Curated annotation (Swiss-Prot):
Record text on subunit structure and interactions: Homodimer.
Native species: Lactobacillus delbrueckii subsp. bulgaricus (strain ATCC 11842 / DSM 20081 / BCRC 10696 / JCM 1002 / NBRC 13953 / NCIMB 11778 / NCTC 12712 / WDCM 00102 / Lb 14)
The protein's name: Nucleoid-associated protein Ldb1634
Chain spans, region Disordered: 18-40
Family statement: Belongs to the YbaB/EbfC family.
């Protein structure tokens, strides 16, 4: 009885080798994700009038608002600045995640 042929396009890897490789990649991805969660990401709006700082797991760590950004006659402006700073911080997390984990997910979708 002959051995089963390797899967075409897999470089001659058998199923056990493929599983080992998949486990190794999974461990590397988990380490990359852990590295991201320990980093801090900052979004700033209007010359640092509002600064939002996040951890890599998307937790808001701090929100700094300069007193001059608080205008009782224009609360919408402050809302817009906070939204802008928060969105910029979250975008930084997304970009770092894509840069770090993108090398593992290329070609999967």
């Amino acid at each position: 009885m002959s051995k089963r042929p390797a899967f075409p396009g897999m470089g001659g890897m058998n199923m056990q080798q493929m599983m080992k490789q998949a486990k190794k990649l999974q461990e590397q991805m988990a380490q990359e994700q852990e590295n991201i969660t320990t980093q801090e990401f900052t979004g700033k709006a209007a010359d640092d009038m509002v600064v939002a700082t996040f951890t890599g797991d998307r937790t808001l760590k701090s929100l700094f608002i300069k007193p001059e950004a608080i205008d009782p006659d224009d609360p919408d402006m402050l809302e817009d600045l906070v939204i802008d700073a928060v969105n910029k911080g979250l975008k930084q997390i997304d970009q770092a995640t894509q840069q770090s984990l993108g090398k593992y997910t290329k070609g999967l979708m």
